[in-house]
């Protein structure tokens, strides 16, 4: 289980390296869709089957529609591949080397610590109880943590969506 999640995490980062070094919108969108699918797989492997399925259906379904429209509008007759430009190829190889160095560091015994993460005790989380057994459901824990511990993240996300509406209106106003 740990190695499966680790391999999916590496694929997740490699997909975003492909997005950040995109030579053409087609390949950037492909890397984003692949990373989104792997991210949903990571959520499912940690027990969030409902959340992973919803993110997969909503996020990737909407992304595929946007990806289809952008590739139709920005079709290049000869799209630039990752190896066609030395700068783009260097960015891709550099990102992959950094990811490889991180993997080697983690397997050699170096560890990562979460700094400043204090979740308190588990009595506030949703617990299903029976006779002598209790079960903490990860789907509900993730949703409740998003709105309680990540409240400023939700506020900032809403504010960014609100501002992006005005940016889109301003960009398309003159046409």
Curated annotation (Swiss-Prot):
Molecular function terms, GO-annotated: NADH dehydrogenase (ubiquinone) activity
Disulfide feature: none
Gene Ontology BP term (one): mitochondrial respiratory chain complex I assembly
Location in or out of the cell: Mitochondrion inner membrane
Listed transmembrane segments: 1-21, 24-44, 46-66, 86-106, 149-169
Signal sequence extent: none
EC numbers on record: 7.1.1.2
Membrane-topology descriptor: Multi-pass membrane protein
Pfam families from the UniProt entry: Oxidored_q3
Catalytic activity: a ubiquinone + NADH + 5 H(+)(in) = a ubiquinol + NAD(+) + 4 H(+)(out)
Gene Ontology CC annotations of this record: mitochondrial inner membrane
Keywords: Electron transport, Membrane, Mitochondrion, Mitochondrion inner membrane, NAD, Respiratory chain, Translocase, Transmembrane, Transmembrane helix, Transport, Ubiquinone
InterPro entries linked: ComplexI_Subunit6, NADH_UbQ/plastoQ_OxRdtase_su6, Nuo/plastoQ_OxRdtase_6_NuoJ
Record has Transmembrane as a keyword: yes
Family from the record: Belongs to the complex I subunit 6 family.
Function field: Core subunit of the mitochondrial membrane respiratory chain NADH dehydrogenase (Complex I) which catalyzes electron transfer from NADH through the respiratory chain, using ubiquinone as an electron acceptor. Essential for the catalytic activity and assembly of complex I.
PANTHER family (UniProt xref): NADH UBIQUINONE OXIDOREDUCTASE SUBUNIT ND6, NADH-UBIQUINONE OXIDOREDUCTASE CHAIN 6
Protein name listed in UniProt: NADH-ubiquinone oxidoreductase chain 6
């Amino acid at each position: 289980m740990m190695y499966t999640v680790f391999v999916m995490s590496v694929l997740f980062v490699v997909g975003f390296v492909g997005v950040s070094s995109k030579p053409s919108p087609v390949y950037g969108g492909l890397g984003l869709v692949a990373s989104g699918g792997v991210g949903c797989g990571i959520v499912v492997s940690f027990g969030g089957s409902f959340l992973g399925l919803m993110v997969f259906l909503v996020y990737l379904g909407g992304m595929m529609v946007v990806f289809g429209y952008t590739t139709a509008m920005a079709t290049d007759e000869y799209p630039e591949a990752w190896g066609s430009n030395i700068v783009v190829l260097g960015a891709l190889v550099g990102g992959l080397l950094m990811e490889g160095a991180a993997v080697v560091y983690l397997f050699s015994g170096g560890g990562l610590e979460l700094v400043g993460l204090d979740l308190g005790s588990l009595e506030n989380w949703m617990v299903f109880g029976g006779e002598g057994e209790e079960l903490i459901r990860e789907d509900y824990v993730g949703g409740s943590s998003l709105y309680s511990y990540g409240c400023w993240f939700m506020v900032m996300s809403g504010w960014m969506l609100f501002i992006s509406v005005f940016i889109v209106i301003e960009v398309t106003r003159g046409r």
